Amino acid sequence: MQYREYGKTGMRLSTLGYGCMRLPSVDGEVDEDEAIRCLREAVERGVNYFDTAWFYHGGNSEIVLGRALKDGYRERIFLSTKNKEKTTDGKKWRSLLDEQLVKLDVDYLDVYHFHGINWEQWTEKLSVPGGPLDEMRNAQKEGIVKHCAFSFHGDAGDVMKLVDTGEFDGMLVQYNLLDRSNEEGIAYANSKGMGVIVMGPVGGGRLGGASKALQEMIPGDVKSTPEA
C-alpha cells in the first residue's frame, strides 16, 4: 500500500480508502458479518482511511463500521464521518455529532465533514456566530474531533471560496476521468496545504465495469473498461 500526507495534519493516509456508503448487503440490509470481514480485511491489507456518514445504509453504516473497529482495529485507522445538518443552530448540529459518536462507539473522530455543503449554506447558516462552525471548534477543543473538513457536490467555483475561508484542514470532492470539474479546486487546495480526498474515483463503477459497446467491438471476455 502507498501512503500520502493529508495536508498539514500529520496524517499519512492510504491512497486507497474504504467508503462505507455501500457495504455488503442482502435484500437491502447490511450483511453485518460479511461487512465486518471485508472492513477488517482491508485494514490487514494496509487501508487506513475509512469514511462513512449518518444516513448511509439507512443509518446502519456507522453502527456496523463501529463494530468492525472493535478488537484493536480502531487504533489502526483514521476514521471519518459527516454531519448532514444545514442549520444555524449549533446545538442541533452538535446533537447529531454526539449521536454519531454513540453509533460508532468511539471517543473521537479523526476527520469530521460538513456534509455536501455549498457556499450559500456556509455563509448563511454554518458559519454564523453560535452556529455549527463554533460547535466544530468546541468539539476540537474537547478532543472529540481532530480535523475539520467539508464534502462537496456543488458548483466547482464554490470549492476555492470554501478553501479561502481558511477554516478547513481538508475536503472530500468528486474526481475521475468522467468528471474533472473539481480539478482546479483540487490543485488550489493542495497549494494552500489542505488535505484532499477524492470520492467516486471510478465513477460509481462506470469506469471499472465492462462496456457493452466495447464488448461488441472487441473479441474475448472483456471484464473492464481499462482492460478493453
Region spans (language model):
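Short low-complexity, flexible loop/linker segments enriched in glycine and/or proline
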Residues: 66-67, 163-165, 186-188, 211-215
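Structural motif corresponding to the early beta-alpha repeats
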Residues: 56, 72-94, 115-116
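Conserved short secondary-structure transition element at the edge of the structured enzyme core
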Residues: 44, 140, 191-194, 201, ...
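Active-site mouth loops of central-metabolism enzymes
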Residues: 21-33, 81-91, 120-124, 151, ...
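Alpha-helix-loop-beta-strand connector modules within alpha/beta enzyme cores
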Residues: 62-81, 132-143, 198
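Short glycine-enriched loops at secondary-structure junctions
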Residues: 55, 153-157, 202-203
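Glycine/proline-rich, positively charged
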Residues: 26-27, 40, 87-184, 190-197
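N-terminal binding-site loop/beta-alpha segment at the start of enzyme catalytic domains
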Residues: 1-77
